[in-house]
């Protein structure tokens, strides 16, 4: 790890925080940043988790203060997510790097579809939301499954959670977003613990990236661009395409 690594990672992680604050999907930029810098995939995932924990902690606290997290619904989902992410992280560390890259290659088109699709989600008013036993079960199941994915890889986790909580658990977008923040914090913490235990986190780089990520998030939230999501979508798709090409070149090389 040298100065060039920091020069590649930090600006992109800053952009990731900025993008995430405006329209979500920052992880689609932050993890590729580590991979572009030539960091091994498992270490890249672990270090990305380290910097992501800071951003998700701030976001979760902010949503909680605004009353956007239903604690009774979030708690079982958070517990399920914690277990799922731990499983996913351990699976990631046991997988050969080549297999992990192949899995990423298969996941990327689906993530790109979610980023591009504008009509997948349906908003619901608070009156339309009916939190029943089914809601608790589907929310916990979603959290567990996405938790495994987040521990295994990560980018797009927030998007997956919002989609599942909206479509499967039938929560409104505002409520789904709030629950997703709490669940995502749990998945990040759980998987980070596993990666730290196995020594696959570059602490100096992670700290620098965390500062850049939080600064980007602060500026992005402050600007609050009305057309932010529309402007960000092409950037996310470009990053996905570049990462797709990067992984193919690694597999062929």
Question: What are the residue ranges of the model-derived segments?
Answer:
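Selected transmembrane alpha-helices and immediately adjacent juxtamembrane segments
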Residues: 1-40, 126-177
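Hydrophobic alpha-helical transmembrane segments in multi-pass integral membrane proteins
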Residues: 145-153, 191-199, 206, 243-253
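Small-residue hotspots at the loop-to-helix junctions and early N-terminal turns
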Residues: 42-46, 177-181
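Transmembrane helix-loop junction
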Residues: 36, 43, 89, 93, ...
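Transmembrane helix exit motif
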Residues: 58-68, 89, 105-131, 244-253
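Residue-level signature of the transmembrane alpha-helical core
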Residues: 10, 14, 18, 49, ...
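Selective hydrophobic functional segments
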Residues: 46-106, 188-238
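Helix-loop junctions at the membrane-solvent interface of multi-pass transporters
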Residues: 22, 65, 94-95, 117-118, ...
């Amino acid at each position: 790890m040298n100065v060039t690594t920091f020069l590649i990672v930090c600006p992109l992680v800053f952009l990731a925080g900025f993008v995430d604050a405006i329209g979500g999907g920052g992880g689609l930029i932050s993890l590729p940043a580590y991979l572009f810098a030539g960091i091994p995939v498992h270490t890249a995932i672990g270090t990305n988790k380290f910097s992501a924990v800071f951003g998700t902690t701030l976001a979760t606290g902010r949503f909680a203060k605004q009353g956007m997290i239903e604690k009774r619904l979030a708690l079982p989902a958070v517990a399920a997510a914690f277990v799922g992410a731990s499983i996913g992280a351990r699976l990631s560390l046991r997988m050969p790097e080549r297999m992990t890259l192949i899995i990423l290659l298969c996941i990327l088109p689906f993530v790109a579809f979610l980023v591009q699709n504008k009509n997948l989600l349906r908003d619901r008013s608070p009156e339309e939301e009916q939190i029943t036993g089914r809601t608790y079960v589907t929310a916990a199941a979603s959290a567990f499954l996405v938790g495994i994915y987040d521990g295994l890889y990560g980018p797009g986790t927030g998007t997956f959670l919002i989609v599942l909580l909206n479509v499967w658990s039938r929560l409104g977008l505002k409520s789904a977003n709030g629950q997703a923040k709490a669940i995502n914090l749990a998945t990040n913490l759980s998987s980070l613990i596993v990666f730290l235990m196995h020594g696959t986190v570059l602490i100096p780089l992670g700290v620098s990236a965390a500062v850049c990520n939080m600064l980007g998030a602060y500026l992005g939230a402050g600007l609050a661009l009305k057309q932010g999501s529309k402007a960000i979508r092409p950037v996310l798709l470009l990053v996905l395409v570049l990462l797709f090409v990067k992984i193919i070149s690694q597999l062929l090389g």
